[in-house]
Amino acid sequence: MSHVHDPQPSPVAGFEQAFTQLQELLAERASRGESERAIHGRDESWHPPQLPDAVVFPQNTEEVSAIARICHAHRVPMIPFGAGSSVEGALIPTHGGVVIDMTQMDQLLAVHPGNFDCVVQPGLHRRALNDLIKDTGLFFSVDPGADATIGGMTSTRASGTNTVRYGTMADMVRGLEVVLADGRIIRTGSRARKSAAGYDLTHLFIGSEGTLGIVTEITVRLYPRPEHVVSATCQFPGVDD
């Protein structure tokens, strides 16, 4: 563990009070264990790992909101965490704080085959989503290399090999439920294909890397499952070719 930067003792003056309140809220789902912190202090990037002060595991939007209110009141940094597959360093808690692991919020909440969309929690993995909806004849098209969570894909504006045909996450998300830094819960967008009702807050949050709020629910667009899938490989002598 010598290569992992540990921010303890926490530079955040109110952390101890905040963690006491988080334990009262979540019981064993609020952890300061070193192994748990180590898992959540890194991603797949080259940036050096750094331990958070604590890790919490909410199971619904109301708990995320309560966590945010506690951390906001004590000025404790919050870092949303999904599959940990990011290669951009955004998950690393450089100032300590509380990592909010969203993986226990992994439900498919609703499917609307007639409208070609569904509503999911952020901790649901993309492959699991496609397994759950395969009987509808529809599929979720965005396919980054890793089996990322839908929340993580939204926060990073993910893309993949299917992007040239179907589009990126910016094209797939129709609406969001988001918990703001002070714990307020807002909804953006709608299931309508076209809407000019107010500011386009949905696309403000897509790709924001968790800096503007914590995504707790996503309405995503679906496509008819292709009847045939063909793969091909192209080889080139060098990069210039």
Language-model features and meaning:
Residues 1-72, 85-116:
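N-terminal flexible segment immediately upstream of the FAD-binding catalytic core
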Residues 32-33, 81, 129, 143:
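Residue-level detector of family-conserved "landmark" positions at structurally sensitive sites
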Residues 35, 82-85, 145, 191:
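Short, ordered loop/turn segments at secondary-structure junctions
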Residues 72-74, 81-83, 148, 172:
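Short, basic and Ser/Thr-rich N-terminal targeting/leader segments
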Residues 76-77, 139:
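Residue-level detector of anion-binding/catalytic polar loops
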Residues 80-84, 91, 102, 122, ...:
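Glycine-rich, histidine-containing beta strand-loop boundary motifs that form or position
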Residues 107-111, 120-241:
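FAD-binding subdomain of flavoenzyme oxidoreductases
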